[in-house]
Amino acid sequence: MARTKQTARKSTGGKAPRKQLATKAARKSAPTTGGVKKPHRYRPGTVALREIRRYQKSTELLIRKLPFQRLVREIAQDFKTDLRFQSAAIGALQEASEAYLVGLFEDTNLCAIHAKRVTIMPKDIQLARRIRGERA
């Protein structure tokens, strides 16, 4: 038997079209100005999941170096004025800070999941720190 080319067909499944109100019908019949195509948008959560996968793969520092350096210097001024830092020292502080924050956010996420939520909240961070023994 010879193969035949299949043609595309419209799907027949799905919901039946509802009757439109008069205002909607009038709005639809009005001519649209130009063929302006609305920009493509991903479904909520898709981009977030893509970013999670991207940042879990990578090893680079996520906080910019100069803002972090300014923060370190600002905090250090409370203890002693005119302190100087080697660039390696600031790098080590940033590496440790980011590792701590990533771990804290992982624990925070587990606390939110335990509460049957997907959104982390301040109370999740407080619980994670309490369990770790960082805050009594």
Swiss-Prot record:
Post-translational changes noted in the entry: Acetylation is generally linked to gene activation.
Compartments (UniProt record): Nucleus; Chromosome
Spans annotated as Disordered: 1-43
Keywords, comma-separated and alphabetical: Acetylation, Chromosome, DNA-binding, Methylation, Nucleosome core, Nucleus, Phosphoprotein
Modified residues (Phosphoserine): S11, S29
Residues bearing PTM N6,N6-dimethyllysine: K5, K10, K28
Record-listed N6-acetyllysine modification sites: K5, K10, K15, K24
Subunit relationships: The nucleosome is a histone octamer containing two molecules each of H2A, H2B, H3 and H4 assembled in one H3-H4 heterotetramer and two H2A-H2B heterodimers. The octamer wraps approximately 147 bp of DNA.
PANTHER family per UniProt: HISTONE H3
Protein name in UniProt: Histone H3.3 type 1
